[in-house]
A protein has these predicted regions:
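N-terminal nucleic-acid-engaging modules of covalent nucleotidyltransferase systems
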Residues: 1-137
């Protein structure tokens, strides 16, 4: 069974060399792109929205972040009203384990480095997870 993304991020944060073990992990790539690429910042208000945390143990919640990464684009769709995006986001948070919900909020706010200080833009650019930031002319 695949590791939960929070477990992988904890592992990488403990030993940054472990990031090379996950170069083919698309869910991790999505997380890093949305957490660090300004063009992919989710069109949602910053901060933690009001939501009811799921009390189920990790792996027993209705959703898991690995499966939900494919749907991140929804939070940037221009055809959805802001209130609908917020409703969808809150619904996701309520379906995730509290650790994954906390991670999802950090991704949305592009503050992953606050949860995992050793996972930096420089590390991700150096390992090819995200594109290098280019300076505008």
């Amino acid at each position: 069974m695949a590791k939960f993304l929070t477990e992988i991020l904890d592992e990488i944060n403990s030993d940054v060399k472990k990031i090379n073990d996950y170069k083919t992990d698309n869910a991790l790539r999505f997380i890093f792109e949305y957490a660090f690429d300004e063009d992919k910042k989710m069109d949602l208000p910053d901060g933690e929205p009001p939501y009811k945390q799921d009390t189920a143990p990790l792996g027993m919640t209705p959703a898991n972040l690995r499966m939900e990464t494919k749907k991140f684009y929804v939070y940037n769709r221009k055809d959805l009203k802001p209130i609908r995006k917020e409703q969808l986001f809150i619904g996701l948070l309520e379906a995730l384990h509290p650790d994954e919900a906390k991670l999802m909020i950090a991704i949305k706010d592009q503050k992953l480095h606050k949860l995992y200080p050793k996972i930096t833009r420089k590390l991700l650019e150096g390992t090819g997870f995200i594109k290098e930031k280019t300076k505008d002319a």
